[in-house]
């Protein structure tokens, strides 16, 4: 079953100079029980898409889409209150820099118990409070925190970033969401803690059937854990498909450049040889190129690239390029 089905999502920011199109006609789908990766450089629009899904963008943003379906229901056509009710019930999101997302004036116990729904808990107010405490302890155990008493009695500043992120995950799964969105959840964490968190989300997917949208700018980190992968560049979807296929046979020059820039994907690279890197840097929103936004940096760019390429399909592999790699085979 398809949980999330977005077609041609466009996000525009109102500025004093006019509208700036930060996300340009991006399509994204997520099946039940699937882990989908969303990868791209900083500034590619990954977090904006996540915030659009959970409806937390402010009034300066304009959201347009041909389709924005959650379990067959078009969220953009619903009243805001009903939209928020559905999102609050079915979708949860964890952010980067978790210690800044937690309330510094409240203990972890207070914040975690507040995130636990009271529906279905037996007894009066006092009894429900005890049930919430027990469930909070169970949630901490589920995310790998054994010293629950010390963590529950602590304030966020007293905990490490890794423990705070585990607390955020516990708060997110307290209501058993159908979709968990993880927006760069391992930023500034140690490598061992990163692996722990990725394994945790993988186990939640396997044991609970929870779908996960995993957002990162580190291709090697999420490639191991995702079933399908979408690659963004400067607000445009450049490639999408099964993770193994995208990594083995990239059709877009940007995806190919990402893969070549990761040492783990280049086992035959001679020692001390520089990794491949595209020239230049990602453009600012105020100075976006016309047509394909990779054009000024692309080694395969030609005059046709001043026109925005359409999203093409080769079996279950999607790409957006006038001159894809392996051009003859893909035609």
Regions found by a protein language model. Name each.
Residues 74, 130-150, 259:
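Conserved ABC ATPase "signature" region
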């Amino acid at each position: 079953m398809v949980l999330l089905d977005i077609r041609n999502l466009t996000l525009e920011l109102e500025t004093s100079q006019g509208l700036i199109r930060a996300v340009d006609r991006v399509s994204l789908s997520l099946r039940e029980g699937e882990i989908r990766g969303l990868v791209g450089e900083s500034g590619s629009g990954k977090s904006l898409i996540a915030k659009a899904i959970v409806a937390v963008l402010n009034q300066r943003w304009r959201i347009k889409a041909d389709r924005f379906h959650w379990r067959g229901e078009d969220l953009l056509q619903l009243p805001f209150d009903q939209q928020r009710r559905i999102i609050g019930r079915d979708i949860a999101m964890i952010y980067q820099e978790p210690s800044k997302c937690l309330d510094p004036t409240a203990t972890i116990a207070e914040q975690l118990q507040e995130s636990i729904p009271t529906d279905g808990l037996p007894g009066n107010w006092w009894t429900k409070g005890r049930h919430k405490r027990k469930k909070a302890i169970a949630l901490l155990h589920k995310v790998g925190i054994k010293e629950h008493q010390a963590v529950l009695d602590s304030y966020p500043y007293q905990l490490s970033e890794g423990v705070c992120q585990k607390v955020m995950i516990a708060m997110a799964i307290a209501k058993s969401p159908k979709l968990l969105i993880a927006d760069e959840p391992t930023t500034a964490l140690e490598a061992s803690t990163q692996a722990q968190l990725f394994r945790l989300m993988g186990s939640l997917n396997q044991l609970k059937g929870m779908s996960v949208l995993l957002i990162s700018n580190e291709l090697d980190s999420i490639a191991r854990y995702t079933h399908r992968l979408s690659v963004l560049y400067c607000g445009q979807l450049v490639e999408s498909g099964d993770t193994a296929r995208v990594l083995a046979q990239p059709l877009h020059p940007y995806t190919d450049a990402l893969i070549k820039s990761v040492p783990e994907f280049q086992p035959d690279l001679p020692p001390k040889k520089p990794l491949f890197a595209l020239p230049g840097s990602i453009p600012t929103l105020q100075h976006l190129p016309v047509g394909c936004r990779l054009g000024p940096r692309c080694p395969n760019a030609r005059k046709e690239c001043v026109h925005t390429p359409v999203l093409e399909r080769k079996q279950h592999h999607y790409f957006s390029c006038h001159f894809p790699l392996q051009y003859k085979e893909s035609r």
